[in-house]
């Protein structure tokens, strides 16, 4: 099962735009989950993920396979159509 990880900060302007676009995109693929994880949850899990996936800026979307291997990455804002392309694997 493919997942999309979204790394963001609640005070990041571009992150808020991306969040709205994600909601508007209504990606309807059952094999793609949107996983949200604020970059500072205080539990250590987020720190591991930020380091593991080498997150250097937000917002960052990473599509991973079931083993956690990165398939695709995008840093910055995507519009609704671009998000659908990213989810379908046509946006590199």
Regions found by a protein language model. Give the residues of each.
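Local sequence-structure signature of Cys/Sec-based thiol-disulfide redox active-site neighborhoods
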Residues: 1-28
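Short loop/turn microsegments at loop-to-beta-strand junctions
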Residues: 3, 58-59
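Short, flexible active-site loop motifs that bind/organize anionic cofactors or intermediates
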Residues: 8, 40, 73
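Residue-level detector of flexible, active-site-proximal loop/helix-junction positions
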Residues: 11, 34-38, 78
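Thioredoxin-like thiol-disulfide oxidoreductase module
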Residues: 32-57, 67, 85-90
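Non-catalytic, surface beta->alpha helical segment in thiol-disulfide oxidoreductase systems
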Residues: 62-92
């Amino acid at each position: 099962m493919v997942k999309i990880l979204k790394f963001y900060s609640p005070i990041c302007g571009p992150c808020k735009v991306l969040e709205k676009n994600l909601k508007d995109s209504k990606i309807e693929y059952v094999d793609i989950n949107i996983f949200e994880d604020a970059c500072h949850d205080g539990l250590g899990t987020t720190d591991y993920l930020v380091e593991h996936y080498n997150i250097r800026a937000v917002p960052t979307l990473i599509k991973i396979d079931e083993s956690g291997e990165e398939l695709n990455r995008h840093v910055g804002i995507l519009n609704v159509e671009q998000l659908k392309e990213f989810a379908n694997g046509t946006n590199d």
